[in-house]
Design a protein with these regions (language model features):
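A short secondary-structure junction signal
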Residues: 4, 37-40, 184-187, 197, ...
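Short acidic (Asp/Glu) and glycine-rich catalytic loops that position anionic groups and cofactors
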Residues: 30-32, 78, 82, 104, ...
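Electropositive, glycine- and tryptophan-enriched low-complexity nucleic-acid-binding patches
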Residues: 160-208
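Flexible, glycine/threonine-enriched loop-and-boundary segments that flank and lead into catalytic domains
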Residues: 147-166
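Short, conserved catalytic/metal-binding motifs centered on acidic residues
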Residues: 1, 24-34, 173, 180, ...
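Helix-centered, glycine/charged polyanion-binding patches within enzymatic domains
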Residues: 210-250
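Short, glycine-/Ser/Thr-/acidic-enriched flexible segments
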Residues: 33, 153-154, 176-180, 187-190, ...
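Active-site- or DNA-interface-adjacent structural scaffold in DNA-acting proteins
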Residues: 1-152
Length: 250
């Protein structure tokens, strides 16, 4: 990714689409790179985990006492109906039953792991670990699992009225203040505070601009980065639109 960005910047500079002065003034901000996952309700996650374990057992010849192939989807539909009708006590009762079903399938497979060879056991282990996490996690827990196939997904709240929570990974973006050429993009796993990402983002931008012999000297940021200072870079907050550089003067 960084190599592609570096080639893009070098090409833009060689074509004189941007000059050195413009590349030295950047706007830095963070956003969420959303993952293409379904909304992670407890009922759906428990049912997906049960289906995955049953599929793995069938694929590797592990006989289960019961697969709950009929009861599992029925419980998932029932939980959805109760949630829609705002009958939350009934919904919680269904969720407890779904958690019990997942636990039974999980323990059944764990008891029979000795029947399979070491290679199969290692391939199944990662899915058993994730299913165990879904089985034990509760709504108030931290470091929750939001997608069985994508454990890197995090729940991030950015204060948006239309979307209170987004599911993905926090990323930082740096663009030139005049023409909006992307001169930096990187992920920040763990959802760190916005201000704690500024120095790392500018360090990446500085590395990408080495080939054109330019360093960022001005960083325009929002109030999430207030109080942060970076050596050799002037950090500007509360910048008026009129104070931004105009393209014809860059």
């Amino acid at each position: 990714m960084e190599e592609l960005l570096a080639h893009t910047i070098n090409a833009a500079h060689a074509m004189q689409a941007v000059d050195a002065r413009e590349l030295s003034r950047v706007i830095v901000d963070t956003t969420v790179q959303e993952k293409a996952i379904a909304y992670p309700t407890d009922s759906r996650l428990l049912e997906v985990a049960r289906k995955k374990l049953v599929l793995l057992a069938k694929r590797h010849g592990i006989g289960l006492r019961q697969s709950y192939a009929r009861q599992g989807p029925a419980l998932s539909r029932k939980a959805g109906r109760y949630a829609h009708a705002r009958q939350f006590k009934r919904m919680q009762r269904v969720l407890r039953r779904q958690r019990t079903v997942l636990g039974r399938v999980l323990r059944d497979i764990q008891r029979k792991l000795d029947q399979v060879n070491t290679g199969v056991r290692e391939r199944i282990a990662i899915w058993l670990e994730r299913a165990q996490q879904l089985y034990t996690q509760r709504p108030k827990d931290k470091q929750k699992l939001y997608a069985l196939h994508a454990p890197e997904v995090e729940c991030i709240g950015k204060g948006k009225a239309r979307q209170a929570y987004e599911f993905g990974v926090k990323v930082g973006i740096a663009v030139t203040a005049c023409k909006g050429l992307v001169v930096g993009a990187r992920s920040f796993p763990g959802n760190p505070y916005d201000g704690d990402t500024l120095a790392e983002q500018l360090e990446q931008t500085r590395g990408l601009l080495q080939d054109v012999s330019v360093e960022p000297t001005v960083a325009i940021v929002d109030l999430g980065d207030r109080g942060r200072e970076v050596d050799g870079v002037q950090v500007l907050h509360r910048v008026s639109v009129l104070a931004l550089p105009r393209c014809r003067t860059c």
